[in-house]
């Protein structure tokens, strides 16, 4: 409810000309550091980090569980893109559900195994938690035509998600007032 209230407030303030605001609805962003953070979706990052580091991991959702995935790199690119959009051309459109990858846990494990080796699959076990599976394991596919038309994107596929999540890109920054942003995207 609080998210919808903020979206409504930003849209209303932008409509009145009080702010030049934008709101992005973010999916599960991976791969965060493996630290206790209280976030129920942390298992998504923990799975990726454990696999990459060759550590055993007990996944709290089933291999068939589906979730919305985006790398931190892709998320930052989308945030920068939102900041660069011409506010005058946006009109009333100020809220976007970002395009996401809709992947099962097994699809992510497949991509991890392709990069880090099939033998690491044996390090992953499954102990589905019904509550967590209900929250983060049954996400439906998303259609985001408005966001795509505005130039927002996802990681393209599971292999790119793994690469973008676990191999950080060069640092980027937003320009200071009066500065021009020059960004080059390198494909790993």
Locations of regions flagged by a protein language model:
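Amphipathic terminal alpha-helices
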Residues: 126, 139-149, 156-188
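Mid/C-terminal beta-alpha module of Rossmann-like enzyme folds, strongest
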Residues: 78, 82-135, 174-177
């Amino acid at each position: 409810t609080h998210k919808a209230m903020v979206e409504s407030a930003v849209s209303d303030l932008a409509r009145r000309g009080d702010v030049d605001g934008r709101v992005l609805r973010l999916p599960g962003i991976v791969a965060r550091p493996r630290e206790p953070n209280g976030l129920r979706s942390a298992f998504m990052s923990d799975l990726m980090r454990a696999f990459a580091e060759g550590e055993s991991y007990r996944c709290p959702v089933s291999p068939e569980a589906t979730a919305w995935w985006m790398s931190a790199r892709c998320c930052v690119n989308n945030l920068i893109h939102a900041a660069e959009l011409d506010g005058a051309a946006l009109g009333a459109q100020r809220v976007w559900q970002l395009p996401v990858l809709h992947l099962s846990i097994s699809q992510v494990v497949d991509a991890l195994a392709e990069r880090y080796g099939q033998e690491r699959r044996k390090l992953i076990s499954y102990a589905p938690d019904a509550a967590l599976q209900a929250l983060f394991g049954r996400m439906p596919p998303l259609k985001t035509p408005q966001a795509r038309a505005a130039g927002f994107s996802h990681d393209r596929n599971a292999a790119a998600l793994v690469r973008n999540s676990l191999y950080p890109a060069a640092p980027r920054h937003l320009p200071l007032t009066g500065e021009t942003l020059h960004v080059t995207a390198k494909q790993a």
